[in-house]
């Protein structure tokens, strides 16, 4: 339990940031799930559109510190690779 005033404030701040980060992470997961569902359905046009929407969300999460930039880049790269393989 936090005793000092500054520690109590830090606890409140952490709780707020955790809520924001959780919402952001959830939003990213939803966008990625839409891409994966489109890939599973085999519709290349829908998958490409979903990827185009998901990419900025992933990079924004990396910019905001929700995930590491390399993680976001890796996810975008792998999704793009899978979407591209649908056309082949």
UniProtKB/Swiss-Prot annotation:
Record GO terms (molecular function): small ribosomal subunit rRNA binding; structural constituent of ribosome
Any coiled-coil regions, as ranges: none
GO biological process: translation
InterPro entries: Ribosomal_bS20 (IPR002583), Ribosomal_bS20_sf (IPR036510)
Record keyword Ribonucleoprotein present: yes
Region (Disordered): 64-88
SUPFAM superfamilies: Ribosomal protein S20 (SSF46992)
Name of one Pfam family that matches: Ribosomal_S20p
Chaperone in keyword set: no
Keyword vocabulary terms for this entry: Ribonucleoprotein, Ribosomal protein, RNA-binding, rRNA-binding
Domain of life: Bacteria
GO cellular component: cytosol; small ribosomal subunit
HAMAP family, A to Z: Ribosomal_bS20 (MF_00500)
Chain's role: Binds directly to 16S ribosomal RNA.
Family the entry assigns: Belongs to the bacterial ribosomal protein bS20 family.
Name of protein: Small ribosomal subunit protein bS20
């Amino acid at each position: 339990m936090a005793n000092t005033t500054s520690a109590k404030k830090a606890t409140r701040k952490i709780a707020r940031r955790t809520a924001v980060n959780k919402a952001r992470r959830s939003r990213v997961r939803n966008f990625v799930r839409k891409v994966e569902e489109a890939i599973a359905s085999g519709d290349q046009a829908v998958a490409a559109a979903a990827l185009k929407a998901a990419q900025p969300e992933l990079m924004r999460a990396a910019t905001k510190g929700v995930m590491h930039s390399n993680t976001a880049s890796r996810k975008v790269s792998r999704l793009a690779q899978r979407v591209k393989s649908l056309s082949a």
